[in-house]
Amino acid sequence: MTEEQKPTSEKSVKRKSNTYWEWGKAIIIAVALALLIRHFLFEPYLVEGSSMYPTLHDGERLFVNKSVNYIGEIERGDIVIINGDTSKVHYVKRLIGKPGETVEMKNDTLYINGKKIAEPYLASNKKEAKKLGVNLTGDFGPVKVPKGKYFVMGDNRLNSMDSRNGLGLIAENRIVGTSKFVFFPFHDMRQTK
């Protein structure tokens, strides 16, 4: 090897190692960003069971917006994902009552602080219940929601474990986030209401 060839070869090795280093940095940054986004902003969740039918179906996957825990506020009617007793169990329900509110159900009508609240997302379920000659939601309450807690129910009121039975009132720190979008199955992608 001549002296003229030697520097070119060293430059080539140096260029290759720089290229590998640049690619490595880009991959590390991309993975770190993906982990941060998943932990703090958005995460996919699987719907298990029929408690939110017909709004959500068993086996659907939805994106959960976790940013409501840091900025914004959870609103009545939002679909929320709730941590269960173990890290592998999550519940998907609809937020009905907020801290300080009084929740009551009479004759299939929701009342918050004595004021009638429309629930348009229940229209098809109420129609089916009426055909069967039953109320979709049994009467209950009034229930005063304490500070730091939320009252939730599934849309499939005849088949839902929620704040009325089993789950109880939900502590604010158990709410993972809200969902506004189903992304799987792909042929049925949609916003949730």
From Swiss-Prot:
Family matches, as Pfam families: Peptidase_S26
Residue ranges, Extracellular side: 43-193
Catalyses which reaction(s): Cleavage of hydrophobic, N-terminal signal or leader sequences from secreted and periplasmic proteins
Membrane topology classification: Single-pass type II membrane protein
Active site residues of this protein: S51, K93
Transmembrane segments: 26-42
E.C. code: 3.4.21.89
Protein known as: Signal peptidase I
Topology, Cytoplasmic side: 1-25
Keyword set, alphabetical order: Cell membrane, Hydrolase, Membrane, Protease, Transmembrane, Transmembrane helix
GO molecular function: serine-type endopeptidase activity
Primary localization: membrane
Phylogenetic placement of the source organism: Bacteria, Bacillati, Bacillota, Bacilli, Bacillales
Organism domain of life: Bacteria
Similarity comment: Belongs to the peptidase S26 family.
Example of a GO cellular component annotation carried by this entry: plasma membrane
GO biological process: signal peptide processing
